């Protein structure tokens, strides 16, 4: 019989870049250490990650709402793991088949490129992205139009029911959020070079990657000093979302429209979908209880930064 545990965490490229204060990094680092101890004690045989992408692996040329990687590699953005992940191909295919049979349309990728949204939590929790077998599940959280949140919950439930059939200890990870509205190109606003990137996946040169990294650092500095047009963080909205998860009221989220999420949390707050899927996967096994409950509004990261751990009650 499977044992399922959960760890959801925000991610940020700025954790690996100059700018954030030592106090902030220490505060988040202390919480991550608690999460790491939780994961170490659970000692999973398999990890399933729910994560977004930031136009590093998925592009408007073909943009699935959901995709299961049967083989995957990190692109190495922002100093994260570059190279293959240990993806159990047979299990990943079984998972995708089970999800489809449950009535949730999901694509597969036999060569999924994953970025810091997938890899950073693995490195933070295990020290090495290759430390455990992992099945990466992509959830589109950036490229509009987006599906309703209830379909993300259905995805998580279907995956959770499949995982319950395995004789393994499985850790589900949700990566992203919470409220944040970083500068991300869109079809309507992207200049030609960026448009080619987000539509066709035009490769970025080293110089272009460094320029993007510098732009992210500058945007965070301006945001932290109140000199940015970006949408402010919304700690109250973040708290409401976290309370819903902590109390197990997942069906309440079915009423959250995409417009509401963007208005309250920012355009990239749609990354909460990864948390919804992860908690739904856990809840497929019954009632659960959360353990670590960390939250900090972090303008230096342009994010409401949260971490949760949970096990079945």
UniProtKB/Swiss-Prot annotation:
One Gene Ontology term from the biological process aspect of the record: 3-phenylpropionate catabolic process
Top-rank EC class of the record's enzyme: oxidoreductase
Tree of life domain: Bacteria
Pathway entry: Aromatic compound metabolism; 3-phenylpropanoate degradation
EC nos: 1.13.11.16
InterPro entries assigned: DHPP/DHXA_dioxygenase, Xdiol_dOase_suB
Statement: the UniProt record of this protein carries the keyword Iron: yes
Annotated transmembrane regions: none
Cofactor(s) this protein requires: Fe(2+)
A GO molecular-function descriptor: ferrous iron binding
Disulfide bonds: none
UniProt keyword list: Aromatic hydrocarbons catabolism, Dioxygenase, Iron, Oxidoreductase
Active site, UniProt feature: 116, 180
Catalytic activity: 3-(2,3-dihydroxyphenyl)propanoate + O2 = (2Z,4E)-2-hydroxy-6-oxonona-2,4-dienedioate + H(+); (2E)-3-(2,3-dihydroxyphenyl)prop-2-enoate + O2 = (2Z,4E,7E)-2-hydroxy-6-oxonona-2,4,7-trienedioate + H(+)
Keyword Iron: yes
UniProt function note: Catalyzes the non-heme iron(II)-dependent oxidative cleavage of 2,3-dihydroxyphenylpropionic acid and 2,3-dihydroxicinnamic acid into 2-hydroxy-6-ketononadienedioate and 2-hydroxy-6-ketononatrienedioate, respectively.
Subunit structure, interactors included: Homotetramer.
Family: Belongs to the LigB/MhpB extradiol dioxygenase family.
Name of the featured protein: 2,3-dihydroxyphenylpropionate/2,3-dihydroxicinnamic acid 1,2-dioxygenase
Provenance organism: Mycobacterium sp. (strain KMS)
């Amino acid at each position: 019989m499977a044992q399922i545990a959960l760890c959801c965490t925000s991610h940020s490229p700025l954790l690996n870049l100059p700018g954030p204060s030592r106090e902030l990094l220490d505060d988040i680092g202390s919480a991550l250490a608690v999460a790491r101890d939780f994961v170490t004690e659970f000692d999973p045989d398999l990890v399933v990650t729910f994560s977004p992408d930031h136009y590093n692996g998925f592009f408007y040329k073909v943009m699935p709402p959901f995709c299961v990687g049967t083989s995957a590699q990190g692109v190495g953005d922002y100093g994260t793991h570059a190279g293959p992940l240990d993806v159990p191909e047979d299990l990943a295919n079984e998972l995708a088949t089970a999800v489809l049979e449950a009535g949730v349309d999901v694509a597969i990728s036999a060569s999924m490129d994953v970025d810091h949204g997938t890899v950073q939590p693995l490195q933070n929790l295990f020290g090495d992205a290759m430390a455990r077998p992992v099945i990466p599940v992509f959830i589109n959280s950036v490229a509009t139009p987006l599906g309703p949140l209830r379909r993300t919950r259905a995805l998580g439930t279907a995956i959770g029911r499949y995982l319950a059939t395995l004789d393994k200890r499985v850790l589900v990870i949700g990566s992203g959020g919470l409220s944040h509205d970083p500068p991300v190109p869109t079809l309507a606003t992207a200049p030609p070079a960026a448009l080619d990137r987000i539509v066709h996946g035009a490769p970025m040169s080293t110089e272009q990657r460094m320029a993007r990294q510098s732009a992210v650092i500058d945007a965070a500095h301006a945001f932290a000093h109140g000199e940015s047009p970006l949408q402010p963080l919304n700690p109250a909205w973040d708290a409401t979302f976290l309370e819903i998860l902590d109390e197990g009221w997942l069906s309440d989220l079915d009423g959250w429209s995409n417009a509401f999420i963007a208005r309250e949390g920012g355009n990239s707050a749609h990354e909460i979908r990864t948390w919804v899927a992860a908690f739904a996967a856990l809840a497929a096994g019954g009632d659960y209880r959360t353990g670590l409950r960390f939250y900090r509004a972090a303008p230096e990261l342009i994010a409401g930064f949260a971490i949760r751990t949970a096990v079945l009650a």
